[in-house]
């Protein structure tokens, strides 16, 4: 069950990418430390929500085991993470949507709690992690009432989550450059490098 001290949120794990850096493999299903990457994220966030959404564009039957609901992009050409965010916002059951990428298994509960607690400080605005001055829009907390504004930006041709969220008054959770919790294990080399790390 979700922690009652934190705002009720839906959680979206983005696993709908092309996996180009992995030779076209489905990143969320690649194993790391004996489990698919998606399983590490699911195990971490499951206690925080009763509305866990996975955005995926293939292997839906395998992803179903890790989600309450699956969403897919409305285009077959892998249009990018903003498409998955739109799909998640469209079905989210809670006032907030916490967005995470499937290839970041080193993120921890403390960082997610920090992000969720920030919601009370600016309840009408999105929050993003900012690592060494670099915005990280795929680690974000978005009020679901902004869905229509995000949809409008999409219709205007914007495909960048950062470009869409910043004009909506996005606030930052600041992290030091190189924070290992945000490591994206999106190449075979990075998977190998982080394999022994806990």
From Swiss-Prot:
Main location: cytoplasm
Assigned GO CC terms: cytoplasm
Enzyme nomenclature, EC number: 2.7.7.77
Compartment(s) where it occurs, according to its Swiss-Prot or TrEMBL record: Cytoplasm
Highest taxon listed in the record's lineage: Bacteria
Stored Pfam families: NTP_transf_3
Domain notes: The N-terminal domain determines nucleotide recognition and specific binding, while the C-terminal domain determines the specific binding to the target protein.
Quaternary context: Monomer.
Name of the protein: Molybdenum cofactor guanylyltransferase
